[in-house]
Amino acid sequence: MRLRLIFVIGIIAFCQYNSSAQLKSERQWPTYRGFRSCGVLDNANLPDSFNVVTGYNVLWKTTIPGLGIASPVIWDDRLYITSAVSESDKAGFKPGLYGDVRPVNDSSVHEWKVFCYDKNTGRKIWEQTSCRGIPKIKRHPKSTHANTTLAVNDKYVVAFFGSEGLYCYDNDGKLQWKKDFGLLKSVFFTMESAEWEFASSPVIFDNAVIIQCDILDNSFLAAYDLKTGKELWKTKRDEYPGWCTPNIYEDNGKVCIAVNGFKQRGGYDFVTGKELWTMSGGGDIQIPTPVIGKNLIYFNSAHGKSSPIMAISTGARGDITLREGETTNSYVRWSQPRGGSYMHTMLLYHNKLYNVNWNGTINCLDPDSGKEIYTAKLGNSKSFIASPVASDGKIFIPDEEGTVYIISDAPKLEIISVIPMNSICMTAPAITDGRIYFRTQDNLYAIAKK
């Protein structure tokens, strides 16, 4: 009887530990747009307003050297971010709507850096230079040589700088391993001279790091052992160059990987890399990350002739490409041929699907049916790139010139605050308990109630 009691107590303790550990993991912000790239952290107690000039509700501010549009990531009390530093590349960003596809004409020596800060104080804990040299690929005027967001967990920090390599550090900044993939041609597929730099962020799940490399030649999806860097699998993809980050979803307990694409949008087995389903069509420059809902995966894209938004079943198998004129089939719950965003990852929040377009138009949709809840324009801002995030009924959306719109999660557009940061902002914010972090061209701000 005593042994049985000990056994039962042990099982209860084990379950409570695992539940606590899982909850802890879900409240971290470990990759682009947080846990599973969802962009949501409720019960964070964030302020409704702040002022970067007076310091109202600004907990701290620090200058980030160089240029980067990598979002901050957070694990426990540490915040991590990357940048590419050059003494000669002073072009900065070119905000606004324009059709110029030419890259920035700069061939100066850069240093690719990873920074670790105390999230509470802004104190720099460590800094590492991953590599140094002339970039192998030039950058778009809205881009940098440090576009990809880090992936972190309680032990490791993974940085992917495209043609400059994949790097894994421990959380104290000691290099564990690195990999060189050679030249990854992140270019406009119809104009090879239009080099735009790499931007697909790595994803950590379990014991593996996942990377999606949709490039001009030899596109692939691959998994590497997080501890050693050993290749676990590598799957070829027939795809144009793209800049989208993969995401993790589950189908009846099976862990899968969702990837956006034009010729080969699809799902893959996490363990083997085997393709589970595929679908062609959409915007021919794919950038937004898939968003995971309840038994559905949401995709959007925009460029060329099509700009769809669609909801795909997590149980999809085989080729599920829609025939001409179709908007649904056995695995496509619903789709819209127009309205998808070129740059923005959508936000699924409180049973509403938010799609922000480059000009600041918001489409709020019913995630189950795709029916419009509302469409509205955010203020007078001309251009948006940073994807939205949400907490406690508030949605935070920065425009390119650094104005932050805080709107209510309501059945119609309700603007709570409009806050100028007076500096270009191309980066999705990051949220932790009591704080939200904004990266501008030069600075990183920690915003909290004071």
Task: Specify the residue positions occupied by each region the protein language model found.
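Bacterial Sec-dependent N-terminal signal peptides
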Residues: 1-24
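Noncatalytic, solvent-exposed loop/strand surfaces
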Residues: 21-450
